[in-house]
Amino acid sequence: TSGLIAFPRL
């Protein structure tokens, strides 16, 4: 899963 793509501004 790519969480960074869903929330790149974390």
From Swiss-Prot:
One GO cellular component term: extracellular region
GO biological process terms held by the UniProt record: neuropeptide signaling pathway
Domain of life: Eukaryota
InterPro entries the UniProt entry points to: Periviscerokinin
Keyword NAD: no
Xref: Pfam families: Periviscerokin
Disulfide bonds: none
Keywords: Amidation, Neuropeptide, Secreted
Function in brief: Mediates visceral muscle contractile activity (myotropic activity).
Protein name listed in UniProt: Periviscerokinin-2
